[in-house]
Regions:
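Conserved alpha/beta-domain cores
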Residues: 1-133, 139-141, 147-149
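Expand to "…catalyze enediolate/carbanion chemistry for C-C bond making/breaking, isomerization
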Residues: 160-165
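Short Ser/Thr-rich beta->loop micro-motif in glycosyltransferases that lines
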Residues: 138, 158
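Active-site-proximal glycine-rich helix-loop-beta segment
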Residues: 150-152, 157
Length: 165
């Protein structure tokens, strides 16, 4: 899911009936929605600041739950995209570990209309250098290239469900 409110509406009752369901938050997460995100999601793929990381850690502590975290890297250094600059990733990794987050990997969305291969390769190298186990990259249009660079999570919803209206 990429919207907290939609996930809460769609999945709260379903998750109560089936505790094995694992939900992934893949969209931008605002700090005012963290409480609900931590309650419903098992994975958050879009952490991009100390402020957001701290808020997640605080909410997890309140309800005694651990959410698996990916840091979102703005790998193409695009001003219009969310994500931390690749040069600042190591500091945020250390901070997340220091405050007790279950940081498992990095996530990126490369620039559109550009061959993503170099970006995926760079993300794979960065992920390995930080000794993280998971890599969230690749969408319906480029997931095969992402898999070549060891992506462990791909976002292919539009291939399955069609484009959002």
């Amino acid at each position: 899911e990429n919207k907290v409110q939609e996930a809460v509406e769609k999945w709260t009752e379903i998750k109560k009936k089936n505790s094995k369901i694992r939900l992934h938050m893949i969209g931008k997460l605002q700090t005012n929605k963290v409480k609900f995100a931590v309650q419903i999601f098992n994975y958050i793929h879009s952490v991009d600041s100390k402020k957001l990381a701290k808020k997640i850690a605080d909410e997890q502590h309140k309800i005694n739950k651990k959410v698996k975290i990916f840091l979102q890297v703005n790998i193409g250094d695009e001003y219009q995209k969310s994500g931390i600059n690749k040069n600042d990733v190591q500091k945020l990794v250390f901070y997340c570990k220091e405050i007790g987050l279950d940081l498992i990997g990095l996530m990126c969305i490369p620039p559109i209309n550009v061959d993503p291969e170099n970006y995926f390769g760079e993300m794979n190298e960065l992920n390995k250098s930080l000794d993280l186990s998971e890599l969230s990259m690749g969408m319906s249009s480029d997931f095969l290239i992402a898999a070549k660079y060891f992506s462990t999570y791909v976002r292919i919803g539009s291939s399955i469900f069609g484009k959002r209206s």
